[in-house]
Amino acid sequence: MALTDGGWCLPKRFGAAAADAGDSGPFPAREPSSPLSPISSSSSSCSRGGDRGPCGASNCRTPQLDAEAVAGPPGRSLLLSPYASHPFAAAHGAAAPGVAGPGSALSTWEDLLLFTDLDQAATASKLLWSSRGAKLSPFAAEQPEEMYQTLAALSSQGPAAYDGAPGGFVHSAAAAAAAAAAASSPVYVPTTRVGSMLSGLPYLQGAGSGPSNHAGGAGAHPGWSQASADSPPYGGGGAAGGGAAGPGGAGSATAHASARFPYSPSPPMANGAARDPGGYVAAGGTGAGSVSGGGGSLAAMGGREHQYSSLSAARPLNGTYHHHHHHHPTYSPYMAAPLTPAWPAGPFETPVLHSLQGRAGAPLPVPRGPSTDLLEDLSESRECVNCGSIQTPLWRRDGTGHYLCNACGLYSKMNGLSRPLIKPQKRVPSSRRLGLSCANCHTTTTTLWRRNAEGEPVCNACGLYMKLHGVPRPLAMKKEGIQTRKRKPKNINKSKACSGNSSGSVPMTPTSSSSNSDDCTKNTSPSTQATTSGVGASVMSAVGENANPENSDLKYSGQDGLYIGVSLSSPAEVTSSVRQDSWCALALA
């Protein structure tokens, strides 16, 4: 494989005697002039897809580099304390220089493959840890910050800073390749869930078999997400192992996911191409590097490019990222129909949104309720079973449950019979009946038609005269017009007379007739009559006490409001007036 002038592919093998065992830091001593600078391009690769030369796969080492790797500079010892206690490292790895732990007594150790390509030196480098025999190393309790000192440049490119976070982890070579997605990708997929849902994600379909291809009996980690090609603006390149032939290159190995952001980024774009606002192409690894037990390199990661567009449609959703929990392998999705037709179906999509989007153009159903039932009843075409009416202010039911209009239902309820369908003809006014004439005076105009003893129709005047006098009405009394009485309103004058007596002094003379007194007494209320009787009695007692004829003015205060004062001319007039009034008979008795 031809490398660029500025690029290099230099694996370092550190033996047990390569460095001093007393080094305590992860990188205790660094050579300032050494070309092993961790700064490398995120999209660097030792091998492109298909360009597998003598340096591809496991042939990337040269004899000169092997000699240098065997010797090893004394100041480059590594302290891999997080991996010293790995059970698989104890079984397959040798004692690392400066490592105290179960794996310190072994004969061989891991290879550190450093890849860089200086054609894209602006992006940050990533370290790819490849384990020749160790598989699926667990999460490190604490990752040294010096390994990721160059990732500080990534913090300015994405929403989250991944540099120097304690609790970050790098598995082994395959795990690093799995976590080597872009650090600032807008959508995050949990690494603990990727393995179980690779079959559902179209842009990660090819990587589903990757972690399971490791030989050596470690078992595939369900949460490995496979590396893919990356673009420089998103600060990460797809990582392939030593000699991996992924389409995006393999030099961007160790994307550091901190404990604050335990999600591996979604597949980014390939080979630094400009991102399309509508979407980007993700090159997912198909092989994911089947690591052999004796070899120390990853197999070729084939590039299957899956294009999914309109990712920007998911970005304005208030920055919400769809997370899949580790405990549920497949759970009912809460996102529905694809935001755009080109969006591939995934496990986080639900039929609920499909149904909502499908009914976007359809009118919303009217909620059911009493008012809805009433509207439905009114909208239905009902018909009265009796008269056939379809409109009525109130629908009623008969005993059998059939609908009746308000008139028929009420008639049936009141009379117990069905309402007759034939309406009776309106009665013609008696004064306008054709062919009718009085059998006595032969008039055709009257206010009321009567019948005589023989049953013949007579006018109101002839019928009333016959009823009162028992003889037919004489024709001489016939008049052309109908004479009506001009009736005055009842109780108007009489009420005025009674009120006048109560408001002022009224001279009571003997000429007053008893009929007027009777009428006034009849028209007044019983309380007024009782009051009047009391007044008469008090007046008589006053007259009996005062025998003086000159004292004709009597004033009393017992009945206020009825008579203020009564002026009498003489006792004789009073006596005669009282005797003539019938209402005073009880008082005199």
From Swiss-Prot:
Q: Which GO terms describe its molecular function?
A: chromatin binding; DNA binding; DNA-binding transcription factor activity; DNA-binding transcription factor activity, RNA polymerase II-specific; NFAT protein binding; protein kinase binding; RNA polymerase II cis-regulatory region sequence-specific DNA binding; RNA polymerase II-specific DNA-binding transcription factor binding
Q: Which InterPro entries match?
A: GATA_N (IPR008013), Transcription_factor_GATA (IPR039355), Znf_GATA (IPR000679), Znf_NHR/GATA (IPR013088)
- Per its UniProt entry, which superkingdom is the organism in? Eukaryota
- Where are the zinc-finger regions (GATA-type) in this chain? 384-408, 438-462
- What segments bear the compositional bias annotation Basic residues? 484-493
Subunit comment: Interacts with LMCD1.
Q: What is this protein called?
A: Transcription factor GATA-6
